[in-house]
Amino acid sequence: MTKQRHESAISSTIEPEQRVAATVAGYVYLIAMATSMFAEIYARAPLMVRGNAAQTAINIAANERLFRIGSVIHLLTFASDAVLAVALYVVLRPVNRNLALLAAVWRLVDCSILSVNMLNDFIVLRLVSGTDYLRVFDTKQLQALARLFYSVEASGFQIGFVFLGLGSTVFSVLWLKSRYIPRALAGWGIFASLVLAIVTLVILVFPTLGDAVGLTYMAPMFFYEVGLGLWLLIKGVRIPVVT
C-alpha cells in the first residue's frame, strides 16, 4: 500500500525540469527528423545509382561537397539524438528510474554506432578522390570498394536501428505507464518501436527481405516521433488524472 501511494505521488507530480526536458525533446524530435531526411533525400539519395557502382562513385566524386554536407548533417543529427536520450530520461525517470536509464543507454548506443559508422562515408570519399597512393588499384576496383564501404554503412545503420527500436520501446512503455501523453500515442509508440527493432533484426538475418519491404517498416516510427514531438511542443507533459 505504501509503495502504491509513493508511485501515485510520483506519477501525479511533474517537476519544472521535466517540463523543460519535454520541450527540449519535442524540438529535438522534429529537428532531427527534418535534418536526417534532408541528408538522405537531398544530399545522398540523388547520388546513388542502384546496381551501378561505377556511376555511384562518379556521382560522389563529382558532388563531393554535397556528400560531405550530408555526412556532417548526419553527425549533427546523431549528436542531437544523444541530447534527446538524456531529455527523455529526465522526463521519465520518476516513473521508473532503472527502465528510463536502460532506454537512455540503448538510445546512446544507437548514437554511438551511427556516429562511428559515418567513417565509411569518409573512406568512400578517399576511394573516389583520385589520390596518388590509390593508383595501385584500377578504376573499377576503386569503384567497387567505394560501393562496398557504402553498403557496410547501410548495415551499420541497421544495427543502430535495433538499439533505437529497443530504447524507444522502453521509453514508450514508460510514457504509457506515466500517462503524461495520450495512451493511444504511447501505445502506437510501442508498436512502431517494436516493428523497427524486430523487422531490422529479421533483415540482418535475411538481407533479401530488405529489398522487398524497403523503408515502409520505418513509417510507423516516423509518424510516432513526429506526433510525439508535436505533442511535447504544443501540449507538453500533463499531470495524469488519478481515478
Language model features with spans:
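Hydrophobic, aromatic-enriched alpha-helical segments typical of multi-pass transmembrane helices
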Residues: 2-243
